[in-house]
Amino acid sequence: MSGNDEAAAAGVAPPQTLQFAPFESQIEMPFYSALFSRKLDHDKLDDSVRPVIGLYQPMSERPPAESTRMQIQGGALSSSHVPMGYTRADGSIRNFNTIEDFKKADKGAILRQAGAQIWDAIKDGSIYEIPSLLSSFAILSYADLKKYRFTYWFAYPTLHSVPAWRRDGPLARFSSKETTALVNEVGTFRYAHDTRQHGFFLAKKVPYRSGPFRRGLPRDDSDGDDIGFTWSIGALGEFEKGFFKGIKEEDQYIAFVDSSSYAENPSWPLRNLLVLIRQRFQLQKANILCYRDTQARRDEPRSIVLPLASEGPATPQTSEMPKVTGWERHPSSKLQARVISLAEYMDPTRIADQAVDLNLKLMKWRISPKLDLEAMRSLKCLLLGAGTLGSYVSRNLMGWGVRKITFVDYGNVSFSNPVRQPLFEFEDCLSGGVPKAPKAAEALKKINPGVEAEGHVLSVPMLGHPVLNEAQTKEDFEKLQQLIKAHDVVFLLMDTRESRWLPTVMGKAEGKIVMNAALGFDTYVVMRHGAAPKDGTESTLGCYFCNDVVAPSDSMKDQTLDQQCTVTRPGVAAIASAMLVEMLTSVLQHPQREHAPAPKATGPPGNPEYQRDPPDHALGIVPHQVRGFLANFQNMIISGESYPNCSACSSPIVGAYKSDGWEFVKKALSDKDYVLELSGLAEVQRQAEAMQNEVDWDEDEDVAAAEEGDGEML
């Protein structure tokens, strides 16, 4: 006759099989963002196991199917803080680098390893220090950072009890007064113990002793709260220290925080607790307190007491680990991973912003770990010119993560522009064309809503061009001055040489990084202007005007149609723009930034080689100038020091601008000889002419002497 048959014959209800409510994973959205950020910025290709904290709490007011939630909150990877009312579960996560690695992972071995951690802690007693391991979990995941898809699978490792445990009687509940006293004592216990102890504890009813004192306090029965005993709460480890000594068996309780709201079914953590009870406590019967009460509703009894007994006779302690199960089932009830698409829950603007950062951060994983991406991201870039060069430069800057881009241009979009200038469309040309600068800024925002782009319509004052409206010219100058001061980098991308003169002067005076690109039919030059010397003594690199012995003048006067348009091979602008932005990036990776020296050439003159300076530079060399020739598809790296008599960056010019501001500019625009004289170029020209005259005179004298000599020989 079976045990159940014997019980029935004796008129006793047979023991009931225990059924447990498994945990249901619940990942909050901030956790995904935290995991993605950790993968990009910290873990990179390291897919080692990381600790993670889970939280659960009594959920008696929820429907049973929704009550046993294991919550993974935003700070689960970085914080061990446990909010009031929650219970801690110690878990781990392994985020694989590829979906193939995720699929190939040995799920059985991973589960056994997680179970072994619990089993070993039970055997050696360390479980008493970290009872939260009894509700531990493991997560396998793969985060597709490009598509914002998260594949994951939770395991809640559970040790099987052999023989199994069964109900040994009807469940019991406490009265409202008993529950209130219990909740108060549990709160005191939690206040005095580590959060890892909060989920599992011992409880006992201590009868009032004869006499007037209860725990050292006078008894007061007049308040109606006398329940005939006091609650005493202890940690699991106190069992082996005699916590229940002298306490009647029916007043001894082994408790765990039960998140289940099922009427008679406890939640998952009890299964591991029962293994501990048999292995460490050597018990075959136990009163299990499924603690479901909360401080806020402590007068509403919700906890239940399950009297449990082992189905079979006691087995001797064993070192062999029991069977382990625990993989979470898919909502379809199958044992398989879950997939969530985060894109539908996220702000598209934020997705675009993170996607840009993703492409850049991936470069740091294997190729260039020392790359300083923040140096580019934080830049404020001013683009003088919103045409062909401005369009391509801005797109390349966004590719490097630059968020602040400002355009300055005085022109409108014409019908010839859209095919060469990718920020404009056919509709922008209608009705005389829209202003380029604001339209270019608008186009950037459509490409990446996270970029802070703006456009200003103003005319840059130019040498050699008459001042027709002094008030307007001064207003344009002051606006340009404000913009240059407010930005870190100034790009000179205009059509004419003379339009680059004033921004060169202003950029040098304000200590800004000035980048310059100019195009020919099949040639181009990209360069960085030399920065102002730190101490005013050392030499610096030259600017766009340092090779000139004349000041800029009106280059647009008397131009034919082919001279009025930028006549260049269509690919030249894209090549030059990309190279200019890459040069800026290399500058910012150098420890001296804009003060970085030009690279030194080694090897034969016809085939020079350039070494990284410093050797660990993240991107390579930092050229001063690159001149490209599309006819033979060659580039030349050139460097040159600043010219003491330069019309734009020499000390007299920059000093006059700093001291006089607009008055200097007005005089330079109205007096064609002012810049020549101030810079010293006029004197250089006079000396050159004097030398030329002297050379001409010497040549005439030599010819005359030769003729006389010839005559004498005859």
Curated annotation (Swiss-Prot):
Keyword tags: Autophagy, Cytoplasm, Protein transport, Transport, Ubl conjugation pathway
One of the GO BP terms on file: autophagy of mitochondrion
One Pfam family recorded for the sequence: ThiF
InterPro entries: Atg7, Atg7_N, Atg7_N_1, Atg7_N_2, ThiF/MoeB/HesA, ThiF_NAD_FAD-bd, Ubiquitin-activating_enz
Region Disordered, residue ranges: 591-616, 691-714
Taxonomy, superkingdom: Eukaryota
Keyword Glycoprotein: no
Subcellular compartments: Cytoplasm; Preautophagosomal structure
GO cellular component: phagophore assembly site
Biased composition (Acidic residues): 695-714
Motif annotated as GXGXXG motif, chain positions: 380-390
Active-site residue numbers: 565 (glycyl thioester intermediate)
Record flagged with keyword Cytoplasm: yes
Subunit details: Homodimer.
PANTHER family: UBIQUITIN-ACTIVATING ENZYME E1, UBIQUITIN-LIKE MODIFIER-ACTIVATING ENZYME ATG7
Reported function: E1-like activating enzyme involved in the 2 ubiquitin-like systems required for cytoplasm to vacuole transport (Cvt) and autophagy. Activates ATG12 for its conjugation with ATG5 and ATG8 for its conjugation with phosphatidylethanolamine. Both systems are needed for the ATG8 association to Cvt vesicles and autophagosomes membranes. Autophagy is essential for maintenance of amino acid levels and protein synthesis under nitrogen starvation.
Protein name: Ubiquitin-like modifier-activating enzyme ATG7
